């Protein structure tokens, strides 16, 4: 898909938003993926509950902030669910609410860091990614990158809604205290140092239409073409983690 690239002026004009107002992006989640894992503090039971509560709160707010909702890029599980961001938006946000928009799926994401004054997520990687770019990120506490000093974290539904209602006030108080250098370090550790391209694995979406025969053909092909040295490297690094009782797998090629 070819994405439309817009300059700031054109973007705000296209979405009929006031460019003088603060702009906050809210990143929705894949509504089926990771609902039950990776959270030591459970604020919402699932991503759909969080999305609905967020939209309901936005519906009650004034128009002093531009709120732009971004759908998750993954198609995982969409064939198995009856709702999505667009449907929830249509059901909850009134047509008179001119400052709450959905980011068009044919627009390039390159514009986001150029115009975002803040971003919000429940527990997605966007909170880490945009923190690396020195954009204040509101996330729930108790997720895999929280507690490091580079995000603004909410520990309850009440605190989350307070942040939504008082976004500019909270930003003025907390923005300059955020440590984006820690975000960059955490991103490298998680997506560089602890990642390894296993020669026998490939990206597979269980909601795709690949049948069993196609799946097995892909596996057999990977076995046939496998780089044995790469496999032995993975085996060595994994043994090092297990024997050392280490929490994390380390790809020593990237040290």
Which stretches of residues belong to each language-model region?
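Beta-sheet entry/capping signal
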Residues: 22-25, 64-68, 101, 117-120, ...
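Short secondary-structure boundary/capping segments
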Residues: 39-43, 82-87, 119, 135-137, ...
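Nucleotide-activated donor-binding/catalytic signature segment of Leloir-type glycosyltransferases, i.e.
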Residues: 86-104
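Conserved catalytic-core segment of nucleotide-activated headgroup transferases in glycan assembly
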Residues: 1-91
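Short acidic-hydrophobic, aromatic-tinged amphipathic segments that line or gate anion-handling sites
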Residues: 100-103, 151-166
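A donor-sugar binding/catalytic signature common to diverse glycosyltransferases
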Residues: 104-152
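Flexible loop/turn segments at secondary-structure boundaries
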Residues: 31-36, 74-79, 109-112, 127-129, ...
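C-terminal amphipathic helix plus adjacent low-complexity
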Residues: 1-21, 158-255
């Amino acid at each position: 898909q070819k994405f439309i690239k817009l300059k700031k002026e054109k973007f705000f004009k296209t979405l009929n938003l006031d460019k003088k107002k603060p702009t906050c992006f809210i990143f929705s989640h894949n509504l089926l993926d990771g609902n039950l894992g990776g959270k030591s503090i459970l604020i919402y039971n699932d991503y759909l509950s969080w999305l609905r509560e967020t939209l309901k709160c936005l519906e009650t707010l004034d128009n002093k902030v531009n709120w732009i909702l971004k759908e998750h890029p993954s198609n995982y599980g969409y064939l198995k669910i009856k709702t999505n961001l667009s449907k929830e938006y249509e059901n909850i946000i009134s047509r008179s609410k001119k400052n709450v928009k959905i980011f068009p799926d044919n627009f390039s994401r390159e514009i986001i860091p150029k115009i975002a004054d803040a971003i919000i997520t429940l527990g997605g990687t966007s909170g880490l990614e945009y923190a690396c770019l020195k954009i204040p990120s509101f996330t729930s506490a108790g997720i895999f990158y929280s507690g490091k000093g580079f995000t603004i974290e909410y520990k309850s539904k009440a605190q989350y809604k307070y942040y939504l209602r008082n976004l500019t006030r909270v930003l003025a108080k907390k923005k300059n205290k955020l440590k984006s250098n820690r975000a960059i370090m955490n991103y490298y550790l998680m997506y560089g140092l602890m990642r390894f391209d296993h020669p026998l694995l490939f990206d597979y979406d269980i909601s795709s239409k690949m049948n069993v025969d196609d799946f097995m053909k892909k596996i057999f092909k990977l076995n046939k073409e496998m780089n044995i040295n790469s496999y032995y490297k993975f085996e060595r690094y994994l043994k090092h983690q297990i024997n050392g009782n280490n929490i994390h797998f380390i790809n020593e090629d990237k040290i």
